[in-house]
Amino acid sequence: MCDGAPAPGGADAVHRRLRKALGQALVRWRMLEDGDRVLVALSGGKDSYTLLALLDELRPRAPIRFELVPYHLDQAQPGYDGAPLRRWLEARGGEFHVEREDTYSVVTEKLAPGSTYCSLCSRLRRGILYNAAARLGCTRIALGHHRDDALETLLLNLFFAGELKSMPPALRSDDGRNVVIRPLYLCAEEDIAAFARARAFPILPCNLCGSQDGLQREEVGRLLHDLERRIPNLRATMLSALTKVRPSQLADEELWGRLGIDPSTRPAAP
């Protein structure tokens, strides 16, 4: 979702929670190594600005050395204006890259009017990011997905795709070239939204294409918000569930086979 609910506590409390959650994620899933060069995918939304700002703060005091390479992709969506983002990056200083690839025209040419754009658009954007990381000598790609993104993705796949999957905090790409990390994985969207407002980041519109996938995600986000009003700490509990999978208590025979689970096997005779 583009906006978050009000975050508890003042700006300092929000900042401390975000720093703590980011640090815990980096350590728990071993996201960074000494000497890493990290491409930070900067969309112009509150999440990626927050990610870059927190990593900027962490870098001078971290026990390892790593570089940050902000990278923004202009996908030529209608109504796009990236000038505020570029000015912000110039004021920040240091290396950054803004590149233009007209993926919007590719998607609209290949799909019928009214079709869902997000899947094809995401694949095209992912390929461009992977190639950019390799070309720029980056060893990691950092994305701004947070806790609520992971939970919304879980429910989207459950409700609309019939699959039990979400997004992992870290993964190696299928081609083996890139390691993708999500340092905000433990961060609440409401905290990120509050932090972004306090920092007055120049936010770019988050859904210029008006895709149906984006509307479904907003609907699922509202569902989670409504449920948490009735079930305290629901999202924290759901996130914990993503780290405590019990394959033998599910019904995926292929997964059973890979893990050597055979419920039909009789116990050995005494």
Q: Which residues are covered by each model-predicted region?
A:
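Short, surface-exposed acidic/glycine-rich loop or hinge patches that mediate macromolecular interfaces
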Residues: 75-76, 186, 211
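Flexible helical/loop "lid" subdomain adjacent to adenine-nucleotide binding pockets
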Residues: 27, 33, 37, 159-181, ...
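ATP-dependent adenylation/nucleotidyltransferase module used to activate substrates
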Residues: 1-155, 160-164, 190-198, 249, ...
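Conserved core of the sugar-phosphate nucleotidyltransferase
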Residues: 181-184, 193
